[in-house]
Curated annotation (Swiss-Prot):
One of its GO terms (molecular function) is phosphoribosylaminoimidazolecarboxamide formyltransferase activity. It comes from Pseudoalteromonas translucida (strain TAC 125). The gene is purH. It holds the Pfam family MGS. It catalyses: (6R)-10-formyltetrahydrofolate + 5-amino-1-(5-phospho-beta-D-ribosyl)imidazole-4-carboxamide = 5-formamido-1-(5-phospho-D-ribosyl)imidazole-4-carboxamide + (6S)-5,6,7,8-tetrahydrofolate; IMP + H2O = 5-formamido-1-(5-phospho-D-ribosyl)imidazole-4-carboxamide. InterPro entries: AICAR_Tfase_dup_dom_sf, Cytidine_deaminase-like, MGS-like_dom, MGS-like_dom_sf, PurH-like. This is Bifunctional purine biosynthesis protein PurH. The lineage of its organism: Bacteria, Pseudomonadati, Pseudomonadota, Gammaproteobacteria, Alteromonadales. Pathway: Purine metabolism; IMP biosynthesis via de novo pathway; 5-formamido-1-(5-phospho-D-ribosyl)imidazole-4-carboxamide from 5-amino-1-(5-phospho-D-ribosyl)imidazole-4-carboxamide (10-formyl THF route): step 1/1; Purine metabolism; IMP biosynthesis via de novo pathway; IMP from 5-formamido-1-(5-phospho-D-ribosyl)imidazole-4-carboxamide: step 1/1. Disulfide bonds: none annotated. CDD domains: IMPCH. Belongs to the PurH family. The IMP cyclohydrolase activity resides in the N-terminal region. Residues 1-148 form the MGS-like domain. Its EC number is 2.1.2.3, 3.5.4.10. Keywords: Hydrolase, Multifunctional enzyme, Purine biosynthesis, Transferase.
Amino acid sequence: MDTHRPIRRALLSVSDKTGIVEFARALEAQGVDILSTGGTCKLLADNGIKVTEVSDHTGHPEIMDGRVKTLHPKIHGGILARRGQDESVMAENNISAIDIVVVNLYPFANTVAQENCSLEDAIENIDIGGPTMVRAAAKNHKDVTIVVNASDYDRVISEMQSNKGSTTYKTRFDLAIAAYEHTAQYDGMIANYFGKMVPDYTEEAAEDTKFPRTINMQFTKKQDMRYGENSHQDAAFYVENDIVEASVATATQLQGKALSFNNIADTDAALECVKEFDVPACVIVKHANPCGVSIGSNILEAYERAFKTDPTSAFGGIIAFNQELDAATAEAIVERQFVEVIIAPSVSDAAAKIVSAKQNVRLLVCGQWTDKAAGQDIKRVNGGILVQDRDLGMVTQGDLKVVSKRQPTEQELKDLLFCWKVAKFVKSNAIVYARDGMTIGVGAGQMSRVYSAKIAGIKAADENLEVKGSVMASDAFFPFRDGIDAAAAAGITAVIQPGGSMRDAEVIAAADEAGMAMVLTGMRHFRH
C-alpha cells in the first residue's frame, strides 16, 4: 500500500516566523497552494509569495479581535478529512483538503515570564486555534503532515523533492509525535501558571502559591543507557526542555564511552559543587560525594591538592573544574590516576589531545556559567514526588555569628567559608575538615554526626595530612557535644555549623573548653 501523501495545499500560521518565508517559497516552487492568517499572511505576501488569507478561503472574517480565525469547518474539515473516505462529504460542503499544517503557538511562556505580565495579558496569549489545528493534523497524520518546529522545514522540503512532492508515513508519524509533545508542553505551561494563582477578580479568599495544584513538566530523551544504577535496571537520560544553565544535561562530550547512569549523577554532583567557587577550583567526586576539593592559584594546583585529600577514593572518580582544562592539568590527571569523567567550562586543544591518549575517559565541556538559575528540585518517592526550591543558599563572612570566646583568625574564617561550601554537597550527616583552601578529610552519610567527624579524622590520618590547626564544617547542628570533642581531640581549631540545637550552649561550651572558635551560619544544608 502506498503511504506517500502528496502536498498540494498548505496552511501556515506561525508566531515564531524564523525561516517561514524560505519554507513557503520552497513550497510554492513545488506548486503548493498556500493559506495563511494575520501576520504570517502579510509577511509572505510582502515577500512576493502568492498566499490566500484564511478568511477569504472560508468566506468568514476574523472576529473578536482575532480570537476566532481558523475555527471553521472549511479549515478543520480540510485537515481531518480521511482521504478515500470523506470525499463526498467534502464535495457536499465545498471543503478542500489541506495536506500540510505549519503552526507554532502564541508565546505564552515568554509572556508570563515578564515581570509586569497581567492576568489579562496571559489570557490573550493562550492560543486556541493553533493547538486545535495541530491536534487535528496530528490525529490525521495518515494523510496530513504537521510541522510545529522550524528545524523540520528543511527535512520536509527535502523529502518532498525526493518523493515527487509527497511525504512518507514514517515522517508524518514522527512529526505527529512532535506535535503532541508540543501541545502537551504548551497546555502544561498554562496549567502550571493558573494552578498557582487565584484571579484577582474573584471573591475566592486564597493566596497565590509557587507550587501549582498539578505539576506539568516535559523532558526530552537524550540517550538510552546500557543499564541504570545497577545492571538489572533499564535506564535512559532525559533533559529538561529550554534549560540554559551550564550543566551535565547541556554539556558536550568530546570523547570517551557513553555516559552511564552513575556517571551522570556523579558528574552533576561534582559540577554543582565546583560552581560554588569563584577562584580556580577542583572537585573530585566518588559515589555522589566529594572526596577531594581544593582551590588554588591555578587549576593544576587545585587538582593536585584535591587529589591529595583521598587518592584511594579518587581512583575511578569524576573530576570537575571551574576554569578551562589546560595541558598541564590534563597531563597530571592522565599520568596519575584512572578517571571516569572530566568536566570543565572549556578544554584547550592541547589538553584535549593529551586526554585523547586515554580513549575511555569521558571528556565533557559544559560552557561557562554566571549565576545558578532558580528552580526546583524533585525527589521521587513511591507513589509521589517531593518538590522544593533548589538549595542556592550560601553565607558570606558578614552572615556569620561568632558564639565562642575566641574569635576565629582571618585564615580560619577563609577556611571555614571554604569548608562550608564543600559541606553543602556532602551527603548528610556531613563533616568536612579543611585547611588552607583544601579538604583534608570528609565524613559523609553517617547516621550519627560524631561518626562522620571521626571518619573525617581517620581519612586525614590515613593520608598523613595534618589536622592540627584545621577547621571543621558540619551541614547541620550538633545535637550533642561529642562531635566537638572528637574534632578537638583530632586538632581542629575552628568550627562552622548552623546552630539551633537544644544543646547549643553545651556544644559552645565544649568549643570554649578546647579553645576552639565557633561560628554559626543559621542555615542548614542537609543532603539526602
